Amino acid sequence: MLIRLDKYLADMQVGTRSEVKELIRKKRVTVNDNIVTNPESKINTDGDSVNVDGNAVGYHEYEYFMLNKPAGVVSATDDNTCTTVIDLIKTNNRKDLFPVGRLDKDTEGLLIITNDGAMAHDLLSPKKHVDKTYYAKVKGKISDMEVKQFANGLFVDEELTALPAILKVLSYNSDKDYSEIHVTIHEGKFHQVKRMFTAIGSEVLFLKRITFGALSLDESLKTGEYRALTKEEISILQRNQIKR
């Protein structure tokens, strides 16, 4: 793939576009051992060797991040009124990142940020039914009958009959009248988890996604924090990609 030298360096987080242009003009950048002073010079990402101050800068076409999304942030690339999940990725200069799917504004938890469109498309395909598990606090005491309703596939409303889902009750707080649960769904309809609990006469008080396919949220990530995925985690997503 051919790209401009300044974009190459900015994508690899050497600096901002203006910062890397200054590095290039100061003759601190070499391509195939030759000093290059034109930021617009084309670089072959598959074959050229790029160095800054003698240090090699390899190119990675795709980036993958795990974000522990906080409430109050929207799952979008751009928004004129709200902070977006992309705004939280502070250490990356790439302009082509996007969230894989979405979490509601008031929902927390695991969200994948990438620029790999093919992987995202496959992971979100209705044909793949990639599992997603949520931790939630819901109003009232969840009965065994309601657990079975989820397991059998729940009629939610005229627009949605949910596929069978796994509902596990963790605890019940009788003083405050709420249940802590894990629920695993195999699709991702609009407000699906909230609508499912509304359909059984309950209400979601707090919602956090903790798994996406076989990938689990890193418990060391505080709300609003993120990190790059490991090679093993990327492989996990790729296995989900070819699943079913």
What feature does the model see in each segment?
Residues 2-244:
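Basic, flexible Lys/Arg- and Gly-enriched helix-loop patches that mediate nucleic-acid binding at interfaces
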